[in-house]
Amino acid sequence: ASTCGNMQLYSLIVTQDRALREALSPCHFNQPMVVEAPCLVTVCADVHRFTMWCEQRDADPAYDNFAWFLNAATDALLAAQNLAVEAEMHGLGICYLGTTLYTAERIAKILELPKGVVPLTTIVMGYPDESPELTDRLPLEAVVHYEKYTDYTAAEIDELWAEKEESELTRRLLAENGLDNLAKIFTRNRYRREDNLAISRSYFELLREKGFFNQ
């Protein structure tokens, strides 16, 4: 994968041991695939390894700050997506787990992450028993801008989400959640304000603990 300065500021922790996957399972809300799939990959931003190399060469590293967390996070997520694409090309199924950010402090303790290393996401990997339908996406014009950012009108927002909002899946979700539109499923049930703030505070504290907020 592309990497800042060819520094490879990431680590991929491959967990195949069942006991360790069972220990990590509560961090991912006990989703069955965490234990049932044969391989769990925790993707980490990592300035620790490069910092050690610099120090052992009498160089003065300065990567214990937020700018280099962002560089390391970019490196790590680029590597993660390349791993996911390569796995799928070889017939494996993958699933990203956003729960990593929810419980990053606990994951860091279980995986014994040193200073300068924080978890970003987790990929569950294995040979699938089924072939689920592809998840729908917004049309390309929703995410591609030419020359400059082009803001959206209210009518354009309606048009971009129309297919999602009219799908059978959305109708089923609205019935299950007792809500009148898809947006409220996200804001009231899936990603609530109070949860978002709690996760943010927890992750900022982990970044501070791991040395990414030094001035």
Give the ranges of each region predicted by the language model:
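Acidic, surface-exposed loops and disordered segments
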Residues: A1-Q215
